[in-house]
Amino acid sequence: MIEPDRLISAVSGRERDEQLDRAIRPLKLADYIGQPSVREQMELFIHAARGRQEALDHTLIFGPPGLGKTTLANIIAQEMGVSIKSTSGPVLERPGDLAALLTNLEAGDVLFVDEIHRLSPIVEEVLYPAMEDFQLDIMIGEGPAARSIKLDLPPFTLVGATTRAGMLTNPLRDRFGIVQRLEFYNVEDLATIVSRSAGILGLEIEPQGAAEIAKRARGTPRIANRLLRRVRDFAEVRGQGDITRVIADKALNLLDVDERGFDHLDRRLLLTMIDKFDGGPVGIDNLAAALSEERHTIEDVLEPYLIQQGYIMRTPRGRVVTRHAYLHFGLNIPKRLGPGVTTDLFTSEDGN
């Protein structure tokens, strides 16, 4: 099974790390690094809503974990000058749970629902009129004497976040006036995030040190900040406290995070496909059995970054590794993937 404290997991970790994440989280769009299209659009929408003195349209934010969906929700509330109340889909088990939140909102407030794709159908039904008409339908009594009453709600903004937009029902998705997708970050933006976080934490970091951490952060700010904290530990114990490129490289190698941001679980998945299934195609269930992992763990945790980086492909016949995987491990490339090239273990993937 995947370790709950996996260093390069994009899922929120221990409470201590979550507290530090909150401390370094930007509060304004001006401080929000990366996602230029999303930032520009949200700045426009927020400015327009403020000018009309209206609540911002309901907003759906989706993308892989750790890219800043919660951060963006908090920024929206901050920029609109309103309060934010946060919850998650699994927590809202009954309509009464949702009603209690909605009836305590002030005009313009933001209700943030993480993992909104996990709302139960009965709760989702209550949410529809609340989103569309700012009304809450409540059943009073039981049996033949039961009756429905409508409560007016102040205009509010629902911000929903999900890693699996495809699991949202069409009626719920259609009620969001603003839909934003967050993409993996490039190394330059991640290096800026690392440098900013280091400054907030009072750390001395060289640009090359920030770039080394960013390079191995899998395009994810949450992972970049987690790696920064572990490199800080290494620098304080085995260095002079400053984070240089050499210190970052030594620390991350010690932590078993390679130059591509892969850890032992990523390498195990790739090598299992190469050694046991001849590079694929292999069905997801067979792969899960070979790795002793759950199917959804492979699909949601391990695969996205490997696919995004071009090491794995999904095909109608199953998963296959690409030539990049063979090059990464210094293995012969099968003829079906191109010329039979043998790479030395210490030769980089670009041949240098």
Curated annotation (Swiss-Prot):
SUPFAM superfamilies linked: P-loop containing nucleoside triphosphate hydrolases, Winged helix' DNA-binding domain
Gene3D superfamilies: 1.10.8.60, P-loop containing nucleotide triphosphate hydrolases, Winged helix-like DNA-binding domain superfamily/Winged helix DNA-binding domain
A cellular component annotation (GO) from this entry: Holliday junction resolvase complex
Binding locations of ATP: I24, R25, G66, K69, T70, T71, E132, D133, F134, R175, R222
InterPro entries recorded: AAA+_ATPase, AAA_lid_4, DNA_helicase_Holl-junc_RuvB, P-loop_NTPase, RuvB-like_N, RuvB_C, WH-like_DNA-bd_sf, WH_DNA-bd_sf
UniProt region (Small ATPAse domain (RuvB-S)), positions on chain: 186-256
GO biological process: cellular response to chromate; cellular response to selenite ion; DNA recombination; DNA repair
Protein origin, superkingdom: Bacteria
EC annotation from Swiss-Prot or TrEMBL: 3.6.4.-
Domain notes: Has 3 domains, the large (RuvB-L) and small ATPase (RuvB-S) domains and the C-terminal head (RuvB-H) domain. The head domain binds DNA, while the ATPase domains jointly bind ATP, ADP or are empty depending on the state of the subunit in the translocation cycle. During a single DNA translocation step the structure of each domain remains the same, but their relative positions change.
Family indicated by similarity: Belongs to the RuvB family.
Name of the protein this chain belongs to: Holliday junction branch migration complex subunit RuvB
Gene source species: Pseudomonas aeruginosa (strain ATCC 15692 / DSM 22644 / CIP 104116 / JCM 14847 / LMG 12228 / 1C / PRS 101 / PAO1)
Gene that encodes the chain: ruvB
